[in-house]
């Protein structure tokens, strides 16, 4: 029973983290604090790995040492700074590959990163997705603003390229708040105003503990909640020990972990326990997936609407109302400005925006009209294909309506809508063809409903709603209601 209750509690903690961090992302106040664990999957060492050679030389057992800052100080006392700096260079100069956690974080709209890591993987992950990071390594960097920056990366303990200036020994930790006041002030401000997710961080650094304690004194019970990951102590970790010794070590470490988690709550840091480190990637992937599913592509084109309604105005009002209700429900709409569809999408979206006191249209609508002539030696069809793949990759769901065009005086199904459906499926984006609107969307709906488990094995409860939106005889407002129900369930992950 205790194990079952623990599993329920862990699942609840994960869901709360996902919900709250998504909220922070949508409000543009999410931040990351990265420790050595974030880079471990890329092959870089943690603190113990960094100081193992130093411990061996001091005739100490690195596995028995818990105060690694003092260990670094002992090595410095005996050998000077150059040897320590060389250890940093030897362990962090290798060209490492980004891991999945880096890639996921870089795709999220996070503009603030704090890290104690010396490597440059965070910066690389951001540049790889076309973002422009502004990196702060020393105090003088605060006075310099990188033009058109997308994110700030605060490297409070230094950088591999300045190994001799990294924060590593007890002397440097003790003087951190004197020598790095701008980092301390900046971190305090962000911890008060943003929601942090701590990844790969052990909370052993005295400089962060000092900052957290100051915030606790200043804010009391009004502090903002933050979240961190810990791997839950597992009995299997001690199977290499004799049974009695393993049992005792497991019991001791479990108690210590519980106490540490409870202590972090004093600073409004909510620990989320995972069974294995891969679970962190799964949680981050869920956050990315749900965030993207708040952005909806409306794909479609039309020169006529007869398979759905007899007249143009009724069809335009359907598209208008659908777009308006999507924006009202908190979704951001992306449109390629398809013929006969795009204008109504814009009007419906603006109808809601202008009915409120919100005026930042870019928060609700992404317009990506297709290029009309070829450039850079590409054929126009190839350029369109590349363009489609680019803007579809930025959404999490795609709604397909109508889908026809005129060729040689005849109305035929639109191949472009078919292509966008195939691209979306290939990219793992959830597809919602509204079969009731006819034409290519009807064909795509038939494929989806016939192979429902292929597309929606994780959402069996939505099948009746998908069946409903394929029938043109239903009330148009009810069809829209069902579409909103589907995309809302997809965004929530259930």
Curated annotation (Swiss-Prot):
Residues engaged in binding 3'cADPR: 300-301, 339, 370, 388, 405, 416, 420
Domain called Deacetylase sirtuin-type: residue spans: 11-295
Modes of activity regulation: Probably activated by a signal molecule generated by endogenous ThsB1 and/or ThsB2. Can also be activated by the signal generated by ThsB of B.cereus. The activating molecule might be 3' cyclic ADP-D-ribose (3'cADPR).
Domain of life: Bacteria
Swiss-Prot/TrEMBL keywords: Antiviral defense, Cytoplasm, Hydrolase, NAD
Annotated catalysed reactions: NAD(+) + H2O = ADP-D-ribose + nicotinamide + H(+)
GO BP terms: defense response to virus
EC number(s) recorded for this UniProt protein: 3.2.2.5
Compartmental location: Cytoplasm
Binding site for NAD(+): 30, 119, 157
Family designation: Belongs to the soluble Thoeris ThsA family.
Domain notes: Has an N-terminal deacetylase sirtuin-like domain (SIR2, residues 1-295) and a C-terminal SLOG (STALD)-like domain (residues 296-494). The SIR2 domain has NAD(+) hydrolase activity. The SLOG domain binds cyclic ADP-D-ribose (might be 3'cADPR); binding alters the protein conformation, allowing NAD(+) to access the active site.
Known partners and oligomeric status: Homotetramer.
Listed name of the protein: NAD(+) hydrolase ThsA
């Amino acid at each position: 029973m205790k194990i079952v209750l623990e599993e329920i509690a862990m699942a609840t903690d994960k869901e709360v983290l996902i919900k709250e961090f998504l909220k922070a992302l949508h409000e543009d106040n999410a931040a990351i604090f990265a420790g050595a664990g974030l880079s471990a999957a890329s092959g870089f060492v943690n603190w113990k790995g960094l100081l193992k050679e130093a411990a061996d030389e001091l005739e100490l057992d690195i596995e028995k040492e818990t105060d690694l800052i003092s260990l670094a100080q002992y090595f410095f006392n005996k050998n000077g700074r150059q040897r320590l700096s060389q250890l940093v260079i030897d362990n962090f100069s290798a060209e490492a590959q980004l891991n999945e956690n880096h890639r996921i974080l870089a795709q999220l709209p996070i503009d603030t990163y704090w890290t104690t890591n010396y490597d440059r993987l965070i910066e690389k992950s951001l540049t790889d997705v076309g973002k422009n990071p502004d990196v702060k390594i020393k105090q003088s960097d605060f006075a310099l603003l990188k033009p058109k920056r997308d994110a700030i990366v605060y490297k409070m303990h230094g950088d591999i390229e300045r190994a001799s200036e990294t924060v590593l020994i007890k002397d440097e930790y003790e003087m951190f708040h004197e020598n790095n006041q701008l980092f301390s002030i900046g971190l305090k401000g962000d911890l008060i105003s943003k929601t942090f997710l701590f990844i790969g961080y052990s909370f052993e650094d005295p400089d962060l503990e000092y900052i957290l304690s100051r915030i606790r004194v200043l804010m009391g019970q009004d502090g903002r909640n933050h979240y961190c990951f810990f791997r839950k102590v597992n009995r299997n970790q001690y199977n290499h020990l004799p049974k009695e010794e393993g049992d005792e070590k497991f019991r001791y470490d479990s108690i210590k972990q519980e106490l540490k988690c409870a202590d972090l709550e004093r600073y409004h840091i909510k620990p989320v326990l995972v069974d294995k480190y891969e679970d962190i990637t799964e949680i981050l992937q869920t956050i990315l997936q749900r965030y993207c599913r708040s952005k909806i592509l409306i794909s479609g084109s039309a020169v006529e609407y007869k398979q759905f309604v007899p007249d143009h105005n009724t069809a335009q009002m359907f598209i208008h109302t659908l777009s308006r209700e999507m924006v009202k429900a908190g979704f951001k709409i992306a449109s390629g400005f398809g013929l006969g569809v795009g204008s109504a999408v814009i009007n419906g979206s603006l109808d809601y925006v202008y009915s409120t006191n919100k005026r930042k249209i870019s928060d609700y609508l992404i317009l990506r009209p297709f290029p009309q002539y070829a450039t850079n030696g590409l054929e126009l069809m190839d350029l369109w294909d590349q363009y489609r793949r680019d803007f579809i990759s930025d959404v999490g769901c795609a709604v397909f309506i109508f889908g026809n065009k005129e060729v040689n005086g005849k109305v035929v199904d639109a191949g472009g809508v078919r292509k966008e459906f195939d691209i979306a499926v290939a990219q793992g984006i959830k597809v919602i063809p509204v079969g009731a609107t006819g034409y290519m969307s009807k064909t795509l709906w038939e494929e989806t409903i016939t192979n429902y488990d292929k597309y929606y094995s994780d959402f069996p409860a939505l099948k009746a709603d998908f069946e409903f939106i394929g029938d043109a005889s239903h009330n148009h407002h009810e069809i829209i209601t069902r579409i909103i129900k589907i995309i809302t369930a997809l965004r929530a992950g259930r």
